[in-house]
Amino acid sequence: MKTSRFSNRCRIVLFVSALFSVLSFCRAEDIVLTSTSATYPYERGQWTAEQCAAWQEEYGPIRGINCPYPPCGAMTQEQAIAYAASLGYNSVRWWPSGGTNADDYIKAVEQWAGWADKYGMTVSPVFGFLQSYFSQSDHASALKNLENQVRKIIRHFRGDKRIILWDLWNEPNLNDDDTKEMMEWITKMVTWCQQEGCTQAITSSLIWDGGVSTNQAAASGGRLLRENVEKLMDVHNYHDYSCQDGFNNETPTMYARLKKISDRPIVCTECMTRTNGSTYARTLIDFAKYNINFYTWGLSACDPNWEVRWSRSTFYNWDPMFHNALYADMEPYNESEPQWVKNYQFQGDFGGAKTGAEYTEIWSSRRAWKWMQHGESKGLYCKTIAEAITKVNTHKRDKLYNTIAVRINYASWASSNSAAKTQFNSLLSAAESAGMTVIPILLTSENLRSNVNTLATYAFNFINEYYYDRRIQAWCILEQTDAIGNEENFKSNLETILRKARYAFQNQPLFCAPLVTEGVMPDSTQTDVANLMWQLSDVCGFSASDASMEFLGRMMKHYHRPIFLLGNNSLTEGMQDNHVNWATAAALPSEDVSNYHFNIFFDNNEDRSSRWPGWKAWRWMNRPPTRGLFFSNISSAISMLEELNGTGSPYNSICVALDFRGYRSSQETFFADLENLLSLAAANGITVLPQLLSDTYFRMSAYALTEYVENVLTRYANDTRILAWDLYNKLSSVNSNPTKAESIIDDLFKTARATGAQQPIFMTPSVSVNTFPSGFDPIASLVHGRYDGWSRLAYGSGSVDLCYRIWCMSDVICYTSSQTSLYLGWLNAQAAKFGRPLFCAEWKVPTSEAPSSTMEIFKDMHISWFANGTLDEEMVREFTYRPVSTQH
């Protein structure tokens, strides 16, 4: 830029011109001119305490979000920002495009600022071009070019209230050979911004070395260099993905560290990672105490693959989601999380606030039902580990039971941790060899006489030791074994234990089991001891010798969660209807145990217009894994079923393409054939997935298509023989008419839902994966932070818009595949971003690869599959899902 002296008159003209530019964005009383410089007439110093307070008061608490990208090309960036605003966010932080071209960068900021402002949001741009300059060999030249770009950007946006702060450098090196020079560059950048009269907060993400011990340590080396530069900033800016560290001591120690540097507003510009327990609830509760502004990371499951932690790949199953607020269909990962954002406010006087989250955050119903994707748990109940090992060995061969609930002797564990752990590990090994999982019962009522903090630490340590162990089915934190004396004291102690136990990130559900006696009834609006225990649990457990049908029905109605019964003496009416998992203390008849299977769960389904909520879709799939065959017509399916004639099959479902032309020719014959198919399938223990339409009928009238769908679904709306409905298979695979295709999607879904069908409704889009380039690693390309996914999909004669539209309207997510396992896995990784049960309605096994490779993906990702052609029967019979287990 030019630095030669101008005449006083010329400077005045420029000053007035720029002042009017500033006034277009802010009020006159907001402008503070402190410069006496002729070269930089707008120069200002670091903000004073009063200016910081005015900034915070004007904008209020920042409820920000990082990089709210759309899930795929079917949604625009503006639409994604609008979604973020609807969740309660009021600011956007991101890395504008443009690189080292100042004009392009300015254009990108203008565009995003315009979108954000339209929805009542501010923006916080990051100078993402820093590394491009710093990586150049000629640092003197690079620094000059950087100065030109920074000054031009700041001048352009001077006075723009849409921008709330500038983040000069995101996460410079913590402590290496480059740290010192990076700090020198940032110091210069602060000066340039001040000289250009930057009216927004100047800050930089220098503090990103979190951890309680780090925050408490004295500053030295690279940390001292960074903290000295931090003193130059208008507001403090830090990153922390470990807010739960030290039982939520991380935030107060970080707060103390920053306030020691200088007393300024604090913004945590990156936070929220669920897999280590740094959830919305835990994080924002403590931020509110300490008046901390925030930006969580990620809006929806999308191509950057932020659903999994650093270095992990979305090619494999995951839960919980690492970053992001929403699934790809823009449904919340957890329905409670948007409320934490919308309701966020500073608490002001936090001097006496306790550290730690007062809120005990439980699993969402969706996650609880997703965990149960293996069918019924039929278990044994034991009071000692020794008894459990004996029973496991007794039933190792008969395969009647698949889990065992066992009391852990707290006294033994407390007195001899090593010996107790050895015994417990022996049980886990024995159970694994018998094909059984374990439900440890950590505490019983008599243990509550011990110190509550000691009990809480014990529960935390136990779960933390085995959090990643797939042999654990669930954790019973407390089994109530006798009457409760002081209820208020009991509730307080229980909450303390659960609160600390949940700091151990668990892959398995936690629950309490109240003793159900006469008069105890589930009611989510009540806070008696039993209902409080259920409200604090991921799944609903209870201890009783039996349970009435009324009790079980109320449990499901009020809590919508899987049910675990401990210590039952019989299998009573209503248990199968309400999907009760149990662990018996009695010697039940073998036939009763063998025949215990969940009945299909039907609701009143009063809502005849909306897609199923996610938890309901997962609850529907609370059954043994679907192992199916695909048939292109009813006659071939009937022939197979007649050949079986009740002799048994390794398959438990079939997908059958129905003949719409046959329906139009003779409805009587059509329904007679369909009824014959359903009857034969039921006689062989097989469910049916009908495919109603395909592109063969694309040119038929809308009336003809909807009348057909309405007639078929109405007739079988409550039929337990139907697994699900595929309304249209591979739409636009050969026909290209986007307008008509969209109309078909909307009309058929509307018609199908109006029938009140009790089974999940979906369509299968035409979607596959383009050929990978030579040497391409699909697993590595889906690692956290790698921008890849939807761009490699192909849609036949359709489009990404049609595929996305279909999956957003479907109760379950379905695709077909004839590609090898790596391609199928890639496609499935995109489908899994919708957070719903996955179906492969037609799997054509490629001749170039053994089916076992794809079967491994089906096991890991919990996919219901239908093979086009028979497979090895033993492989099919042994097919089962692997529990989702996520490391910290």
Show where each model-derived region lies:
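Substrate-binding surface in catalytic domains of secreted glycosidases
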Residues: C243-R257, S545-L552, S818-W826
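Boundary at the C-terminal end of the N-terminal hydrophobic targeting segment
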Residues: C26-D30
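Active-site mouth of glycoside hydrolases
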Residues: V32-M233, I261, T275, D303, ...
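Bacterial N-terminal signal peptides
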Residues: V13-V22
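Bacterial N-terminal signal peptides that target proteins for export
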Residues: K2-L14
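Glycine-enriched alpha-helix->loop->beta-strand junction motifs that scaffold or abut catalytic
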Residues: K231-H236, S262-R264, Y290-I292, W534-C540, ...
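Active-site neighborhood of phospho(di)ester-bond hydrolases with catalytic His/Asp-centered motifs
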Residues: S205, Y238, I266-E270, A513, ...
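Substrate-binding cleft of secreted/luminal carbohydrate-active enzymes
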Residues: V267, C271-Q347, P562-W618, P837-Q887
